[in-house]
């Protein structure tokens, strides 16, 4: 999965290509497969994902990871810059993107410290941040779709903060998954990013990673694999309005 122009231009062939991708994604995801992506240092122990001596960030090509993070931010921002005014008739102001931190060195939100191996949106200060070790662990074991999905999901929480209260679901995490599906497939339809071979499999594995002990993939917070897959597919197949409460 790459931003437009990163490899070669996207050739627009209508909706058939993306409907085929969606059908493949649904067929694979609903098969009930779940994986565990460890941090590269054994059990994550109580959800911190910080055990072991080697950090996942040390095991990946930082330049490639940084490029995908920038690409995900760019495509997601461009999608919502068009979508919020067009679909919701309101002006769009992007959240701040503080980007990556490592371990316990992340920004605080409302006086609360950031959590290792997590990605989050801070509503009181309107910013997104993520632990680079979380990104690197999934990037190494799954692929770049991990990065795109996490950023699109957290951006979805920023969008929730911009909507009317009656448009925000009480199942906020699943609605953010729905927004992520609408974002990634909507951005691809518009030529803002391009899907590559294997991206649908990577999306499957990312959504199924609720078996992990990472805070970002905590089942009690985000829903089980089937709930997350269903929410993502709803947005991917039907667009952002299907995600509204």
Residue ranges of predicted features:
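Short pre-active-site segment immediately N-terminal to the catalytic Zn-binding motif
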Residues: 132-149, 164-170
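Short, low-complexity, disordered segments immediately C-terminal to signal peptides
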Residues: 34-57
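C-terminal motif of bacterial Sec signal peptides marking the signal peptidase cleavage site
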Residues: 29-32
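Catalytic zinc-binding patch centered on the HExxH motif and its immediate surroundings
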Residues: 38-42, 101-129
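Catalytic Zn2+-binding segment of zinc metalloproteases
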Residues: 155-170, 183-188
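Long, well-structured alpha-helical subdomains associated
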Residues: 189-245
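An active-site-proximal "capping" alpha-helix that borders the catalytic cofactor pocket
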Residues: 81, 171-186
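Catalytic glutamate of the conserved HExxH
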Residues: 147-162, 178
């Amino acid at each position: 999965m790459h931003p437009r122009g990163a490899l070669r231009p996207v050739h627009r062939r209508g909706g058939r290509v993306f409907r085929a991708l969606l059908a493949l994604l649904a067929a694979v995801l609903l098969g009930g497969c779940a994986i565990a992506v460890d941090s590269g240092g054994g059990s994550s122990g109580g959800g911190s994902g910080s055990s072991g001596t080697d950090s996942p960030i040390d095991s990946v090509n930082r330049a490639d990871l940084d490029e995908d993070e920038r690409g995900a931010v760019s495509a997601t921002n461009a999608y919502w810059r068009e979508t919020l005014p067009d679909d919701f008739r309101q002006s769009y102001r992007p959240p701040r993107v503080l980007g990556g931190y490592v371990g316990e060195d992340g920004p605080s939100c409302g006086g609360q410290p950031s959590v290792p191996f997590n990605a989050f949106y801070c509503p009181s200060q309107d910013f997104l941040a993520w632990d680079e070790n979380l990104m690197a662990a999934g990037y190494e074991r799954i692929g770049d779709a991990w990065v795109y999905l996490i950023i699109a999901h957290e951006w979805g929480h920023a969008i929730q903060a911009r909507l009317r209260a009656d448009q925000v679901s009480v199942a906020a995490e699943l609605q953010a998954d729905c927004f992520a599906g609408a974002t990634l497939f909507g951005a691809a339809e518009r030529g803002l990013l391009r899907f590559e071979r294997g991206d649908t499999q990577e999306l499957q594995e990312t959504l199924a990673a609720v078996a992990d002990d990472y805070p970002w993939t905590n089942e009690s917070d985000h829903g089980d694999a089937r709930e997350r897959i269903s929410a993502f597919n709803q947005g991917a197949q039907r667009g952002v309005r299907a995600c509204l409460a």
